[in-house]
Swiss-Prot record:
GO terms for molecular function: chitin binding. Keywords: Antibiotic, Antimicrobial, Chitin-binding, Disulfide bond, Fungicide. It comes from the Eukaryota. This is Penaeidin-1. InterPro entries: Penaeidin. It comes from Penaeus vannamei (Whiteleg shrimp). It is found in: Cytoplasmic granule. One of its GO terms (biological process) is defense response to fungus. It holds the Pfam family Penaeidin. Disulfide bonds join C25-C38, C27-C45, C39-C46. Antibacterial activity against M.luteus and E.coli bacteria. Antifungal activity against N.crassa and F.oxysporum. Presents chitin-binding activity.
Length: 50
């Protein structure tokens, strides 16, 4: 992972509770293409975005 983490070892988010910025990245005011990019990069998809 790059950026955001200050600890020596970045820990993956718990299942069902990704970090807030990923939720925002995937779900909040994004176009479909941006949401897809977030899905590909972070594995965080917002299925409400069509």
């Amino acid at each position: 992972y790059r950026g955001g983490y200050t600890g020596p070892i970045p820990r993956p988010p718990p299942i069902g509770r990704p970090p807030l910025r990923l939720v925002v990245c995937a779900c909040y005011r994004l176009s479909v293409s941006d949401a897809r990019n977030c899905c590909i990069k972070f594995g965080s998809c917002c299925h409400l975005v069509k």
